[in-house]
Amino acid sequence: MARTVATFFLMLVSLACLDAIERPPQVQVYTRHPPENGKTNFLNCYVSQFHPPHIEIELLKNGKKIEKVEMSDLSFSKDWTFYLLAHTEFTPTANDKYACRVSHVTLKEPKVVTWERDM
């Protein structure tokens, strides 16, 4: 009986420690297909390795929020950090600038990662 209580107590302590871990998100912005001006494509913002799970992700066109953005389900990795994919259909042009803005408790201000079309 004492062993069961001790095991249960250790599990509770472990779970409490998981909530104390904070990791900032890693952000990658890329397209599904090689970009061509005037040709429809998908813009992706992959956010990973963050904890706790609450996060805000926005895709931006010329600094303004894109309204029609889809999100994958929140998932977690083996190390209990989380990852999420935000994506939208878009048609790139030579003049438009695209970015992903991420807000998370570990960041003092939102992290903005610009899409580099030559990568």
Swiss-Prot record:
Matching PROSITE patterns: IG_LIKE, IG_MHC
Keyword vocabulary terms for this entry: Disulfide bond, Immunity, Immunoglobulin domain, MHC I, Secreted, Signal
Keyword presence, Cell membrane: no
Superkingdom, natural source: Eukaryota
SMART domains: IGc1 (SM00407)
GO cellular component: extracellular region; MHC class I protein complex
Pfam families, per the entry: C1-set (PF07654)
Domain Ig-like C1-type: from-to ranges: 25-114
Cited InterPro entries: B2Microglobulin (IPR015707), Ig-like_dom (IPR007110), Ig-like_dom_sf (IPR036179), Ig-like_fold (IPR013783), Ig/MHC_CS (IPR003006), Ig_C1-set (IPR003597), MHC/Immunoglobulin (IPR050160)
GO biological process: antigen processing and presentation of peptide antigen via MHC class I; immune response
Entry's localization field: Secreted
Keyword Disulfide bond listed: yes
Signal peptide location: 1-20
Disulfide bond entries: C45-C100
TM segment ranges: none
The protein's assembly and partners: Heterodimer of an alpha chain and a beta chain. Beta-2-microglobulin is the beta-chain of major histocompatibility complex class I molecules.
Role noted for this protein: Component of the class I major histocompatibility complex (MHC). Involved in the presentation of peptide antigens to the immune system.
Family, similarity comment: Belongs to the beta-2-microglobulin family.
Protein name as it appears in the record: Beta-2-microglobulin
Gene (UniProt): B2M
